[in-house]
């Protein structure tokens, strides 16, 4: 695999960097004894963002490593590896799983993550 990040990996990396900053804001909220419900909302926003990053990585894996493995005759092993990777990921396998849509650009209706640093 190439050392250069794919567009999807860059998107996931950028999202994770945003999450890191958001988590720092949540820590500050807790340290300043912020209202519990406000903290819970921010934690939910981070969880949602992590789930989106995971979906982006799934799309990337399917388009790169997985497809290469299938073309190279290692399809069954690739399928087993993928099943093992997602079986404990409710956002990918649960009743509300959203695997479709724009993985990199995100949908136009998606709301941006609130900025916890201003809380």
UniProtKB/Swiss-Prot annotation:
GO terms for cellular component: cytoplasm; plasma membrane; protein-DNA complex. Induction: Highly up-regulated during the early stages of invasion of the human blood-brain barrier. Residues 99-119 are annotated as: Disordered. Keywords: Copper, Cytoplasm, DNA-binding, Metal-binding, Repressor, Transcription, Transcription regulation. Belongs to the CsoR family. It comes from Mycobacterium tuberculosis (strain ATCC 25618 / H37Rv). GO terms for molecular function: copper ion binding; copper ion sensor activity; DNA binding; DNA-binding transcription repressor activity; transcription cis-regulatory region binding. Changing residue 61 to A: Loss of ability to bind copper; loss of ability to dissociate from DNA in the presence of copper. Changing residue 35 to F: No effect in ability to bind copper. CDD domains: TthCsoR-like_DUF156 (cd10151). Cu cation binds at residues 36, 61, 65. Changing residue 52 to A: Loss of ability to bind to DNA. Changing residue 81 to A: Decrease in ability to dissociate from DNA in the presence of copper. Copper-sensitive repressor that has a key role in copper homeostasis. It is part of the cso operon involved in the cellular response to increasing concentrations of copper inside the bacterium, which can be highly toxic. In the presence of copper, CsoR fully dissociates from the promoter in the cso operon, leading to the transcription of its genes. Binds to a GC-rich pseudopallindromic sequence, 5'-GTAGCCCACCCCCAGTGGGGTGGGA-3', in the cso promoter region. Homodimer. This is Copper-sensing transcriptional repressor CsoR. This protein has an antiparallel four-helix bundle architecture that represents a novel DNA-binding fold. It is found in: Cytoplasm. One of its GO terms (biological process) is response to silver ion.
